[in-house]
């Protein structure tokens, strides 16, 4: 199995999806019987957008490829936290880096794609989800009922670089990007050739909004001081004008509480380093930061919130994964 992840052109993804559905009644290996069809028009609003269900995949391997976003939609996901991008997008990551015996472990925080490649994947996924909704009649709403949420990291200096800034601005409005225009062209060609069931008007391709995401979930490194986290959030809210969530870690609860929870739930084999809790943000500091940023978000006309929970640093036994933590 190759450890190099190579992007697939949108037209090839579309052909794969259509051929598999026609021949096997499955899409990206998900059988039709497992597709989730919304049976009513109920939804909630977040970031000024409609969202049909309160579930979806968190940032990670499950959201870094276009076909994974399509699969998540097919199985009921409607809020998609896209995998985190950062300025260091060409790191050599020792493999394997993920292990899920029951609870999940990972030893890396990079992406397998460069930032421009990740951007392209998210645009392709955006189109695939729109196509599936229209083709299969999955939603009962007359307008979009799902939300794409960016995730960026890990410090202000990196987030301000042209590479990450272009990523953010591109997902806010992708209309002028090469990949968005390519997807429109390829989708129109497929519609005009009669390849897509239940979609016959090529104008459908033009109806897909280029405004893919107006929100960001911020990811920072363990041990990042509260004032630095708040500074990044203020930049995203005040300068980028995006709805902002920040990921907070279980270390806020303190070592003794987390240890007790693990032991009570029979996860006593998980080992933690108490020093990890000493270096991370404290609960009282988090409360102050949240109050400050909620007020700042209101001043700027955007929402601020937190994601609970992000990752927890644990001691690696070294049996299956590299690195010590």
What are these model-derived regions, one by one?
Residues 36-56:
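N-terminal amphipathic alpha-helix/helix-capping segment at the start of soluble metabolic enzymes
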Residues 321-325:
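Short, intrinsically disordered, charge-balanced linker/junction segments flanking boundaries
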Residues 2-12, 16-34, 38-39, 59-61, ...:
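Active-site entrance/lid segments in N-terminal catalytic domains of soluble metabolic enzymes
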């Amino acid at each position: 199995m190759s450890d190099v992840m190579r992007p697939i052109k949108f037209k090839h993804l579309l052909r794969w999806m259509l051929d598999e559905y026609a021949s096997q009644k499955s899409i990206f290996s998900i059988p039709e019987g497992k597709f989730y069809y919304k049976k009513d028009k109920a939804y909630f609003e977040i970031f000024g957008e409609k969202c049909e269900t309160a579930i979806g995949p968190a940032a990670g391997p499950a959201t870094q490829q276009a076909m994974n976003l399509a699969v998540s939609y097919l199985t009921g996901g409607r809020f998609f936290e896209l995998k985190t991008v950062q300025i260091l997008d060409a790191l050599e990551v020792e493999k394997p880096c993920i292990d899920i015996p029951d609870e999940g472990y990972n030893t890396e925080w990079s992406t397998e794609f460069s930032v421009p490649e990740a951007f392209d994947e998210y645009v392709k996924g955006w189109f695939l989800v729109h196509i599936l909704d229209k083709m299969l009649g999955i939603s009962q709403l007359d307008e979009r009922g799902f939300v794409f949420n960016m995730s960026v990291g890990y410090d202000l200096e990196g987030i301000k670089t042209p590479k990450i800034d272009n990523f953010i601005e591109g997902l806010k409005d992708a209309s002028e990007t090469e990949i968005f225009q390519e997807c429109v062209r390829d989708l129109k060609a497929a519609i005009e050739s009669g390849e897509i069931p239940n979609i016959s008007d090529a104008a459908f391709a033009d109806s897909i909004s280029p405004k893919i995401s107006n929100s960001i979930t911020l990811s920072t490194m363990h041990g990042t001081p509260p004032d630095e986290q708040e500074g990044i959030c203020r930049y995203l809210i005040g300068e980028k004008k995006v709805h902002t969530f920040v990921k907070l870690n279980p270390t806020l609860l303190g070592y003794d509480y987390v240890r007790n929870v693990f032991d009570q739930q029979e996860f006593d084999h998980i080992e933690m380093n108490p020093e990890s809790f000493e270096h991370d943000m404290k609960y009282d500091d988090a409360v102050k930061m949240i109050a400050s940023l909620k007020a700042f978000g209101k001043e700027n006309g955007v929402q601020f919130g937190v994601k609970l929970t992000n990752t927890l640093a644990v001691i690696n036994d070294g049996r299956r994964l590299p690195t010590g933590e």
